[in-house]
């Protein structure tokens, strides 16, 4: 569990001896495109609050989304006015526009429009979108025309994060009739978490994190959590001031194959995996555990017929071996050949 980097002795027991979550349990029966409930266990005591609070803060503050940043209404010079033939005043119309949820697949600002001329209710479904923008809640009420008049609007949509008040859109050109809007970019509607007790064997002093996420539909709850975890990982990885290595169980030091976890040299066929998972790994040309752990989870999910169920199965097995996806093993193929030669000589 010790290895050297230059003159420093790195003690990997600091992280290797901690219990690690086996998998994220996705409650598929209750989950929808806008709601997700996830269980994450086992965790060391106190980690439930630490991880839950960090994820919640990042989910609510840092994910990108689309929103209106400005509107122009034909015949209207400012928001503190009324429009003849429309029930709502301009202030109420703007409040309704802020409730329209959008999805956008580009970072470039987009311009949309709305035109109606018949008496009746105007909703977000009347907004004329393009190939880059989708209205997620077309039923959202915008205005009520009490007579046959023309209502024309032009919108600018941008990507952003968090909440940006109208006065912060400083780069928008000041012009008569342009009304800047407060923009709520966050695709997350709400996040809650609770920490419960978890059991590992006969020990019950572990945490289970139960996380619930509500989104506007522009991102799935599962992806929202994944993005937030990635943000946290990227922000704190700068504190790791050494190259991570995989230390063996015997505390050996050195640069040969002896300082690696022996499980890395196992063939895929030696693992107690389902036939489906094994076949998926073969189709991805993965023949050893060492090759497997150097893959990223996202890359594995791109493999044909490889789904979340197979991923969770393999992650649980790797965890039991003290391994995980995304590991860095310099010169693994060379070390694997050395290990095979050693096994051959010993036989």
Curated annotation (Swiss-Prot):
GO CC annotations on file: cytoplasm; DNA-directed RNA polymerase complex
Enzyme Commission numbers on file: 2.7.7.6
Disulfide-bond pairs as recorded: none
Keywords: DNA-directed RNA polymerase, Nucleotidyltransferase, Transcription, Transferase
Coiled-coil regions listed: none
Top-level taxon of origin: Bacteria
GO molecular function terms noted in the UniProt entry: DNA binding; DNA-directed RNA polymerase activity; protein dimerization activity
Entry keyword annotation includes Lipoprotein: no
Function, in words: DNA-dependent RNA polymerase catalyzes the transcription of DNA into RNA using the four ribonucleoside triphosphates as substrates.
Subunit composition and interactions: Homodimer. The RNAP catalytic core consists of 2 alpha, 1 beta, 1 beta' and 1 omega subunit. When a sigma factor is associated with the core the holoenzyme is formed, which can initiate transcription.
The name this protein goes by in its record: DNA-directed RNA polymerase subunit alpha
